[in-house]
Curated annotation (Swiss-Prot):
Catalyzes the formation of 6,7-dimethyl-8-ribityllumazine by condensation of 5-amino-6-(D-ribitylamino)uracil with 3,4-dihydroxy-2-butanone 4-phosphate. This is the penultimate step in the biosynthesis of riboflavin. Keywords: Riboflavin biosynthesis, Transferase. One of its GO terms (biological process) is riboflavin biosynthetic process. One of its GO terms (cellular component) is riboflavin synthase complex. Belongs to the DMRL synthase family. Its EC number is 2.5.1.78. This is 6,7-dimethyl-8-ribityllumazine synthase. It comes from Geobacter metallireducens (strain ATCC 53774 / DSM 7210 / GS-15).
Amino acid sequence: MPRFIEGKLDATGLKFGIIVGRFNSFIGERLLEGALDALVRNGADEATIDVARVPGAFEIPLTAKKMAQTGSYDAIICLGAVIRGSTPHFDYVAAEVSKGVAHVSLETGVPVSFGVLTTDTIEQAVERAGTKAGNKGFDAAMTAIETVRVFREFR
């Protein structure tokens, strides 16, 4: 019979770093509210949550790496919004942010969850930041909690 390893949604005693891009701040702040709600609902103490605001999404991966390298965080949650415009800038930023965040997690071994919206329109971003399509900040925080707990089962 195989052993199934699953993470409990219990943030009690865990320390989280959250990074929020200020560009498209209306969206970023809704994502942050969702992430904080998920963490506190699942037992996190607000005093164990650090929030770093950075200029935009492009700065998120390096900030996540610096946070992870401190060894102070059980998980890092990355939040922001990259919304398509009329130039190829969106494609470059969206690709680099997603690759960069994944690289930080693989390089450091610290769970880094991706709650950076990459949408075609502002309406899609609003939907994913707490209206019709739920709150992806909440989802990213839940992912962070569960991943930490799965990793703890490997010990």
